[in-house]
Design a protein with these regions (language model features):
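N-terminal presequence-like segments and the immediate start of the first folded domain
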Residues: 4, 16-90, 94-99, 104-107, ...
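Core hydrophobic alpha-helical transmembrane segments of single-pass membrane proteins
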Residues: 11-13
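Sec-dependent signal peptide hydrophobic core
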Residues: 5-9
Length: 166
């Protein structure tokens, strides 16, 4: 089971902003053109460590009531995509820290968005990338448009996979 999870995490790697940590290696094709701007890495090889799977995060506080309380939904889930992504990434960063990890340990970011409009991928990716850029790190990334998330007001959910030292 452990090998299967390791293999699955290695397969789903695809980018955001950075040079990798000691246990990660950014993989590029032999014909990689460094003049082309890529906001993510094509692949990340995990050389050692343990896989850390974060639950999907939202703009709601990490610890919130289930089922959701309407007043919390209205307080945190406004109609501002960038604000929801920022609050979500703040929660992701708190969870990474609690697990003894940092943004440089992230190997993959899944971004689920509802109500996609022209430019949403660029806007949401720019906010996500801003959390990795100071660490010169580009995790692999998957952007997906979905029909709906947990609440009608929810515009984004983000899940992260990281690798931490043994």
């Amino acid at each position: 089971m452990r090998k299967l999870l390791f293999f699955a995490a290695a397969l789903i790697a695809a980018p955001v902003y950075a040079q990798s940590g000691n246990n990660l290696e950014i993989i590029h094709h032999p014909n990689y053109d460094k003049s082309v701007f890529m906001p993510f890495s094509p692949a990340i090889k995990i050389k050692s460590g343990k896989i850390l799977w974060l639950a999907g995060g939202t703009a709601l506080p990490v610890y919130h009531d289930h089922p959701h309380k309407r007043e919390q939904v209205l307080q945190y889930l406004n109609n501002d995509l960038e604000a929801q992504v920022r609050r979500t990434m703040d929660g992701v960063m708190e969870t990474l820290k609690a697990a003894g990890a940092s943004p440089k340990d992230v190997v993959h970011v899944f971004i689920f968005r509802t109500r996609p409009r022209m430019g949403d991928i660029g806007r949401s990716s720019a906010v996500v990338n801003s959390y990795f850029a100071p660490h010169n790190h580009k995790p692999t990334t998957t952007n997906m448009a979905v029909l709906e998330l947990g609440e009608p007001e929810q515009l984004v959910e983000i899940q992260v996979v990281a690798v931490v030292d043994n």
